[in-house]
């Protein structure tokens, strides 16, 4: 009995990590309100950087890169519809959930300056994921992460669709998809 008491006294305190909810729509609203109070116009919508990390509904992480993201003149501040980027299932890879920070260090942090930008896109508005919190902590320390810019947003219709085909291992042909033209822009 005495041994048990001493054993409990010597037990080291466990380092429990706190999981913080991240709600994309709330963060966006707070940011825009802050800009409005400062009389600063909102930034132009950016949907894609060179690197994209997707968090699916199950909390799993996926990654894809695009060399040439289409760039065109934004018609107005309310132009919030992403471009069709011709994403294919083969371009998306799964990242082990507990290795996301290491993945960023090995594959993004050491790239040329314009390639050290990341979009984190979530299928859900609320992100409740310990690994996401680790990524956010890492990215917020620009000296150690060497990431120039990052943005968190909801997934696009194209990302949702292509990821579904990837996960179900189904044949994908973008022309056969009935795209909602109010959610995606096609340029000819």
Report each predicted region and the residues it spans.
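C-terminal motif of bacterial Sec signal peptides marking the signal peptidase cleavage site
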Residues: 5-8
